């Protein structure tokens, strides 16, 4: 389980989304307000952002609230497309940097909020870790993000207890799914935020219904029920 956040819009500092908001990921790492499973997200954190078309990552297996080095550098990290997460490891899963989102295939950044039985996922060398989220990410990358809707529906059918909230970014798109956990959206004048839970009390936040696919581009936001989804158009 985790809390994750994505941004697509104007260039902004990473700190403005992750550290500065009153209920941002820094606070969500120890006091989330809407988390259904787990009480804290102290098993690591990761920030990914796009440097032009190149995805960059900074990940740690330590709690976000205590990372003074990241806190000092985050205001200088700026991008038009950002994906960040704080992690609460599923019981039995390793606590290590390679198990910490965001995961990448060199083009996309991806985070998974939830849990899935690894037995329903194909084993493969592409996964960054043996944890369920990393194997799920590798499965999604293998099928392609254009098939995200179909992939989530199939995995959900194979594991009825799975929670499959995905957030992915490629520099020009944000793609997300809701499957068993919360996701909120904020349309700002300078861009769009997708987040597991609101980072402040702005009245503009709205909740995404469960079992939906969300796509954010420069043209706008599209929501599709997952039983009708075939991935981003």
Curated annotation (Swiss-Prot):
GO terms for biological process: ergothioneine biosynthetic process. Disulfide bonds: none annotated. Coiled coil: none annotated. The active site is at residue 2. Signal peptide: none annotated. Gene3D superfamilies: Glutamine Phosphoribosylpyrophosphate, subunit 1, domain 1. Its EC number is 3.5.1.118. The keyword Hydrolase applies. Pathway: Amino-acid biosynthesis; ergothioneine biosynthesis. GO terms for molecular function: hydrolase activity, acting on carbon-nitrogen (but not peptide) bonds, in linear amides. The keyword Translocase does not apply. It catalyses: gamma-L-glutamyl-hercynylcysteine S-oxide + H2O = S-(hercyn-2-yl)-L-cysteine S-oxide + L-glutamate. Induction: Expressed in log phase, part of the egtA-egtB-egtC-egtD operon, which does not include egtE. InterPro entries: EgtC (IPR017808), EgtC-like (IPR026869), EgtC_Actinobacteria (IPR032889), Gamma-glu_amide_hydrolase (IPR052373), GATase_2_dom (IPR017932), Ntn_hydrolases_N (IPR029055). Residues 2-233 form the Glutamine amidotransferase type-2 domain. It holds the Pfam family GATase_4. It comes from the Bacteria. Keywords: Glutamine amidotransferase, Hydrolase. Catalyzes the hydrolysis of the gamma-glutamyl amide bond of hercynyl-gamma-L-glutamyl-L-cysteine sulfoxide to produce hercynylcysteine sulfoxide, a step in the biosynthesis pathway of ergothioneine. ERG is one of the major redox buffers which protects bacteria against redox stressors and antibiotics; loss of ERG or mycothiol (MSH, the other major redox buffer in this bacteria) leads to respiratory alterations and bioenergetic deficiencies that negatively impact virulence. HAMAP family: EgtC. PANTHER family: GAMMA-GLUTAMYL-HERCYNYLCYSTEINE SULFOXIDE HYDROLASE (PTHR43187:SF2), GLUTAMINE AMIDOTRANSFERASE DUG3-RELATED (PTHR43187). This is Gamma-glutamyl-hercynylcysteine sulfoxide hydrolase. It comes from Mycobacterium tuberculosis (strain CDC 1551 / Oshkosh).
